[in-house]
Amino acid sequence: MILGIILGLFIYIYLINIKFFNRAVPSSLLVGENKLKCKFPSGPLILPIIGSLYKLSLKYPHLSFKQLSDKYGKVFSLKMGSIDTIVINDINFLQKSFRDNPTFFSQRFHLPSFYYMGKYQGIIFGNGSHWRKLKDILSSSITKSKSRQMEELFYNEYFKAEEYLLKKINQDNNIDMGPIFKRILLNILYRFLFGVSFEYDDNLLSKEFYSFIQSYNKLFEYLAKQPADFIPILKPFNNYKEIEKEYNNCLNFFQPLIDNILKNISDDDDDGNEPKCFLEYFISEIRKDTSNLIKITDLPYICFDIIVAGIVTTSTTMDWMLLYLTNYPNIQEKLFFEINTPNHPLHKDKLQFPYLNSIIKETLRISPPAPFALPHICTDDIVIDDIFIPKNTQVIPNIYGCNRSNIESSESNVFNPDHFLSKDELNIGQCAFSFGSRQCPGANVADSIMFLVSTKLYKTFKFERTTTQLNDENGHFTRSLSPFEFKSKLIIRK
């Protein structure tokens, strides 16, 4: 009897794998000489209930995707519990999919836990006409608020951080810059959104601020532990209510700021007063929109998405950049030589600093803060480069793998800014902010922040490791791919 059960299980596993991998490509998609080549991508063995989840590391999922890519190809398939999934590990294929075929891939794949973070009314998880209108208004508001005042905002917040650092190094010149980068970004985003900022000295911060940070950390801990998103029989054991609770706690932190702006802003768009912050621009654009798709009540969800995206991507990238510059002091010195100019550069001067730009690009390439992007859904059957992607498939771009796809394997894990100074720069590329209609609308703002802060920070300070051992370049995956905590010694440059 036991032998029969085992045999039956093997037959069942065989049949579900045959059904999954041997999919018939619709005849309407079979054209030209490639009819016989076109197929659904291969992948690891599927098991009942869990699918291919046994192949994924909870600690390093991006590395699991890369290893599976090495075995099954740059585009492979797997079953994430009950969800049919295709993972893209090739930057050229990603461009052909998301950039060249946006109508097939512009929609977000909705995992159940996503609903409890704004009911799909924000910029990150939204879909359809609401999301398209929101993106248009957001992009328009960012464009209108991008000005010399924004650059002054970045510099003002940087100088506050520099003043804090100068005091700090006199007390204990053994500094973890990670929290400081996060505070710089949080202050820039809050000043940008609401016209307010926070102190750098933790002793001067309010209990509401600490409550926000605590809820923010808990929220992403819960999101990282949601097996019920993939395995339906585990739904009774989900903690979606905890996600909703911590998310609402985060919203409560800046709701008073939104209320204050709404109270003080005029209902008359032609009152002649210049908007004082981004949110005033944004509210003005909402009021002008005749479709009424975006509501004032959506503002907390939108603000949360902007703050989280900015902190996770930009501050983490700045932390990684510092790690590499302390590991490779010759690169740091070459950077200093380029940025040691009499004046503070503006964003319009960016092209005059090719080495700094290449360092930022290389940091995003080798250590992308979001090693794999949030999932998309393929909304109709499509064939790209002889690879069949069926309708309703979850599509995950493995940014970590894509950023290594056009570089020789011996060089792909080596930090080398010269990658982006060579004649092959356009062929190398990096896709930290993705491609197509879902490309981060704040990518240019993030780029401005990293450029402007770096031109001042690395001109004022030289950073050294506090030990002879190199800082760990592998990092760990929490809400983002982050470096392990490391400390630096700061030397004021004369």
Curated annotation (Swiss-Prot):
Nucleus is among the record's keywords: no
Keyword Iron annotated: yes
Binding residue positions for heme: C440
A single GO molecular function term of this UniProt record: heme binding
CDD domains registered for this protein in UniProt: CYP1_2-like
Primary site of residence: membrane
Cofactor(s) listed: heme
Stored Gene3D superfamilies: Cytochrome P450
Keyword entries, A-Z: Heme, Iron, Membrane, Metal-binding, Monooxygenase, Oxidoreductase, Transmembrane, Transmembrane helix
Name the record gives this protein: Probable cytochrome P450 515A1
Organism in which the protein naturally occurs: Dictyostelium discoideum
Lineage of origin: Eukaryota, Amoebozoa, Evosea, Eumycetozoa, Dictyostelia
